[in-house]
Curated annotation (Swiss-Prot):
Organism: Nitrosococcus oceani (strain ATCC 19707 / BCRC 17464 / JCM 30415 / NCIMB 11848 / C-107)
Protein name from the UniProt record: Large ribosomal subunit protein bL20
MF-aspect GO terms: rRNA binding; structural constituent of ribosome
HAMAP family: Ribosomal_bL20 (MF_00382)
PANTHER family referenced in this protein's UniProt entry, alphabetically: 39S RIBOSOMAL PROTEIN L20
Gene3D superfamilies: 6.10.160.10, Ribosomal protein L20
The protein's role, per its UniProt record: Binds directly to 23S ribosomal RNA and is necessary for the in vitro assembly process of the 50S ribosomal subunit. It is not involved in the protein synthesizing functions of that subunit.
The family this protein is said to belong to: Belongs to the bacterial ribosomal protein bL20 family.
Top-level taxon of origin: Bacteria
GO cellular component: ribonucleoprotein complex; ribosome
Length: 119
């Protein structure tokens, strides 16, 4: 068996890591060991935050819907309950967008929810 020298493979791997660390500051951009740690940590943060972003946006939508609902004389929970009773299937993302961009449409929906609650 001939001896396997891994210099080419190792160099390619190091090059790949250094390329991923482009834009980092200090030794994180050009020292393999430090860059590798930085990239690993960055990947972990990215993975975690892709999931957190979904939670944060939902929380933002709920805050916006609640504020608009209170202007219409309803709390958030009563509005959602009224929408379910009225069989209006609009998700929170669209409701929040209506609350910000089209107050008249949101008010109409809120009124329908009020009617459904009183029945």
């Amino acid at each position: 068996m001939p001896r396997v020298k891994r210099g080419v493979t190792a160099h390619a791997r190091h090059k790949k890591v250094i390329a991923q660390a482009k834009g980092y500051r200090g030794r994180r951009k050009n020292v393999y060991r430090v860059a590798n740690q930085a990239i690993t940590r960055a990947s972990q943060y990215a993975y975690r935050d892709r999931r957190q972003r979904k939670r944060q946006f939902r929380a933002l939508w709920i805050v916006r819907i609640n504020a608009a609902a209170r202007e219409c004389g309803l709390s958030y929970s009563r509005l959602i309950s009224g929408l379910k009773r009225a069989a209006i299937e609009i998700d929170r993302k669209v409701l929040a967008d209506l609350a910000v961009r089209d107050k008249a449409a949101f008010t109409t929906i809120a009124e329908q929810a009020k009617v459904a609650l009183s029945d």
